[in-house]
Structures are given as C-alpha cells and as structure tokens.
Swiss-Prot record:
The keyword Glycosyltransferase belongs to this UniProt entry's keyword annotation: no
Family: Belongs to the universal ribosomal protein uS19 family.
Organism, scientific name: Myxococcus xanthus (strain DK1622)
Keyword Ribosomal protein: yes
Pfam families, A to Z: Ribosomal_S19
Protein name per UniProt: Small ribosomal subunit protein uS19
GO biological process: ribosomal small subunit assembly; translation
Length: 95
C-alpha cells in the first residue's frame, strides 16, 4: 500500500538535518545510519550513507535514479550462498 501524498515521504529528521548541515558547510562525509526506512530525497544526491544491514554498514552512494526509494533497498540483509551443486552420476561404460 502506497503512502498518502498529503503526508509526504518519510525521512528521519536527523538525516535531513545532517545533510542540510553538510550542504551549508560544503562538506562530503559518510553519514552512518540505521534508518533503512527513510526515503531518499533529491537533496541526498551525491552523498554517501553507511546503511546498517543488521551486521555491518554498507556504503551507499546516492544517485538521481535512487530518489524516491528507501535506503534499505540498497543494503541487502541476506547473503545468498548459491544453490547446492547437482552431483554428476558416473555412467556405466557401454551404455
């Protein structure tokens, strides 16, 4: 279910404040966050966020294509080990 347009996108206040401060001081630093639920705003483009995936922080560099998505979409929480390999059965000679 989509979020109501009148409510606007959800972004944690501390993220907006940190990015605004960085824009004012013309700084580029990695912003460490646990807020996977925050929506990426146009002001975030060009900045790097370290998004927690439950175990470690994954660096996410924000581009224009990411605007409107959530930060958590770019920090996968599960590792895929691959499917088990199918064992080859040796064929009997002459068959």
């Amino acid at each position: 279910m989509a979020r109501s347009i009148k409510k606007g996108p959800f972004v944690d206040d501390f993220l907006v404040k940190k990015i605004e401060d960085m824009i004012k001081t013309n700084k580029k630093a990695v912003v460490k966050t646990w807020s996977r639920r925050s929506t990426i705003l146009p002001e975030f483009v060009g900045h790097t966020f370290a998004v927690h995936n439950g175990k470690k922080f994954i660096p996410v560099f924000v581009t224009e294509n990411m605007v409107g998505h959530k930060l958590g979409e770019f920090a996968p929480t599960r590792t895929f080990g691959g499917h088990s390999a199918e064992k080859k059965v040796a064929k009997a000679p002459g068959k």
